[in-house]
Amino acid sequence: MASYDKISDGWYRVCPKRSSNRALITVKLPFSTLFRLKPMTDITPFANRLGKNIKHLMKWAKRNGIEAWRIYDRDIPQFPFAADVYGDRIHLQEYDTGWLMRPEEYEAWLAEVLEAVAFVTGFAPEQIRLKRRERQKGLQQYEKTGKAGDDFVITENGRKFWVNLDKYLDTGLFLDHRNTRKKVGETAAGKRFLNLFSYTGSFTVYAATGGAASSETVDLSNTYLDWAKRNFELNGIDTERHKIVRADVFQYLQTAYGEGRRFDLIVMDPPSFSNSKKMSDILDIQRDHKKLIDGAVKLLASDGILYFSNNLRSFVLDDLVSEQYAVKDISKQSVPEDFRNKKIHRCWEIRHKS
C-alpha cells in the first residue's frame, strides 16, 4: 500500500512505498494553487482507442517481424500511459502529470485501466508490467526499480535482443529508434561502425548482422556493456571484429582521434543529462552537443555519416553545427509508425561538407 499525506480537507499526496509492487502517484506541488482532476469514470474511450490501435498495427508488426511495438502512446490526455507489447507481455508506463486525486479514486481508476488493458489485449494480468515515470533529470534508463524480473528474448527485423521489463525503468531496447536501427543495418555492409553511448548495443547488432567490416561499441556502464555482449552472442556476432569498449565518450573521442582511428558510420544517442560519478564531468546535452558532434565528425571518413539523436524536448541544435557540416534533419522519418508522438526524439544525419 501507499502512504497518504494529508494536504487539506479531502486532499492527499499519494506516495508509493519502495516495497510496493504497484506504481502509485507521487504529487509535487509546483504552485500554491491546488486543482482537481475530474475523474474519468468511463473507461470506454481508453479501451476503444487501445483496440483501434491494436487492430491497425498488429498486421503491420507481424509483417515486419516486430515483436516489440507500441499500442498506446498517451493518445487520450486523461489516460497518460504508454503501452508496449513485448512478445507475450505488456510494458505499461504511467507518466507523471502532477494531478491530485483522492487515494480511493486513484486506486479505482488504475484498476480500471489495468482491467481494460488485459481485456482488450487478451493478456493475463500477470503479463502486464506497470511502471511510473517521474519528472526528473538524470539517466533514467540506468535507474533500478528494486525488482529483479526476468530476462527474455524478443525479435525485431530478424535480430534478437534480451529485454527485462522489471529491473530498470527502461527495458534494454528503445523502440522509438527502430527505424534508425534498420537504416543502419541496411547501409553498414563493409563499413567501419562506431556506436557511442551504446546502451545495450542494439545499433551494433544491426550493423554487424548487416555486414559491417568492424565496429566499436562504447559506453561507461559495465551493466549495459555486459548486456550488449549477451546481445552479440545471441546474434552470433564475432567480438574480435566487433569490440566492446568501456570508456567516457568525451575521453574516447580524444583518444581515438589521436590514434588515427576512422569510421564510415557513427551513431551517437546520448542521454539528455547525466551526473554519473563514473564520468569526468556532468553531461548536459544542450550545452555539450557541439563538442560531442565535433569530436565524432573528426573520426568520420571523408564520405562517412554520423547519426546524432537525443530526446530532450527543448533541444536546439547549435547553428554552428549546420554552418560547419552538411546537416539533414531526419526526425520525421526516424520515428516509427506505432508512435503517435512524433517528437519523442530528434535525429540528424551529419556529414563533412563537400
From Swiss-Prot:
Does Nucleotide-binding show up as a keyword for this record? no
- Domain of life of the native organism: Bacteria
GO cellular component: a single term: cytoplasm
Q: Which reaction is catalysed here? A: guanosine(2069) in 23S rRNA + S-adenosyl-L-methionine = N(2)-methylguanosine(2069) in 23S rRNA + S-adenosyl-L-homocysteine + H(+)
Annotated compartments: Cytoplasm
Task: Output the GO biological process annotations, alphabetical, semicolon-separated.
Answer: methylation; rRNA processing
Q: Which UniProt keywords apply?
A: Cytoplasm, Methyltransferase, RNA-binding, rRNA processing, S-adenosyl-L-methionine, Transferase
Q: What is its EC number?
A: 2.1.1.264
Example GO molecular function term? methyltransferase activity
Q: Does the keyword Transcription regulation apply?
A: no
Function (record text): Specifically methylates the guanine in position 2069 (m7G2069) of 23S rRNA.
Family to which the UniProt record says this protein belongs: Belongs to the methyltransferase superfamily.
**What protein name is recorded for this chain?**
Ribosomal RNA large subunit methyltransferase K
Which organism's genome codes for this protein?
A: Neisseria meningitidis serogroup B (strain ATCC BAA-335 / MC58)
Q: Which gene encodes it?
A: rlmK
